[in-house]
Structures are given as structure tokens and as C-alpha cells.
Amino acid sequence: MEQGSQISSSIQSLTKDKEIRYTDEELIIRFQYGDEQAFVELVNRYRNRLMTFVCGYVFDIDKAEDLVQDTFVKLYTKKDSYKPIAKFSTWIYTIAGNLAKTELRKRKRRPEYTFTQLGSNEWEFTLPAAEPETGETVEDHLLMKQIYKAIQVLPEQSRIVVILRDMQELTYKEISMIVDVPLGTVKSRINRARLKIQQALEEFR
């Protein structure tokens, strides 16, 4: 009877957990206390976002996948280093960004990659579907593809901040902490990036 009661309590707990939408900060704290499912949820939330972010540095999907995997390994093994004084998103993006920068330093004496060399398929995962989604016009679909292409050819410093702001929807303050530059610099880089994107779109039209 006691065992049946324990099982019932566990099922109720699991059902309740599924109904609750935990914040990232609540999930990492739950993970710190041993909740493995909280780790899985964080991975699910951030896998694609980090792929887009890291690819903005390395322009190589295979390498980006490796770096994102390394980011989650660090999340798993260094979970206790997270302190609730910072947002989880800032913390995880900083880890991923540092790993990407380390990879770039390793490439210093290797031939540099360019968007042309990699080909458009390297970034296909960030682009809209091959066919317009329901309710989306062909014109809107093509416009979105042009926006992504314009972002891809921006200088790295501009590309990263505009990805974080306009694609990942992070705040200016979060971006400043992640890329480790003053808030004013972040804003000016984003403004310049948006201007270049606008110019590219005008040429497209």
C-alpha cells in the first residue's frame, strides 16, 4: 500500500511538472538539485538558438554542432558555477561564445572560411522552409531569405550582435554582457548592422 502511494505521488508530481512552465533560471536551479529532466528541457530550449549564434562565429555547421555540444557538456559538468545573480541566457551564451572564440583563435593560421566557399546550404537550418508557410506570401518568404543572407555577410562584430538582438531577442544589456563590450557600443553596432541590412534589401528590391 505504501509503495502504491509513493507511485501515485510520483505520477502526480510528474503531471504537475508538465503543466508548469518553468523559467530558465528555475530550471537550472532544479538541475543543480539533481533534476535531470530540467537539463533536458534547457537543451531543448537552447539547442537551435545556440546553433544560430555559434554559426555566426564559425560559419561551419559541423563545427557549430560540436561547439554547441561542448556548451551543453559544460552546462552539465559546471552547473554549480551558475549563480542566480545573472540570467541563465546570458550565462549559456557567454559559454558558447567563449568556445567559439577559442575555435577562431585555433584557425588563425588556417585559410579563412568565406560565405562563398561554404555555400548557402551551410546556413540552411536558419532559413525559412523551402516553401512558404501557411499564411505567408511568396514575397514575404523571399524577403526573409534576403534578410538572412544580408546578416550572413555582415562583419563578425555586427553579425553577432544583430543575431542576438533581432533573431534571439535578447536585451541590449544581455548582449553587452555576452560580447563583453559597453552598452553604447552594442547599440551602435546593431544600428550599423541594421543599416547595412536595409541597404542590401533596397538593392534586392
What positions do the PLM features span?
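Sigma70-family region 2
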Residues: Q32-Y33, F72-K87, R107
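Short, charged helix-capping/linker segments at alpha-helix termini
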Residues: K16, Q32-E41, M51-D70, L183, ...
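Structural recognition of an alpha-helix C-terminal capping motif at a helix-to-coil junction
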Residues: T52, D66-V73, A86-N98
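A short pre-motif secondary-structure segment
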Residues: V161-R165
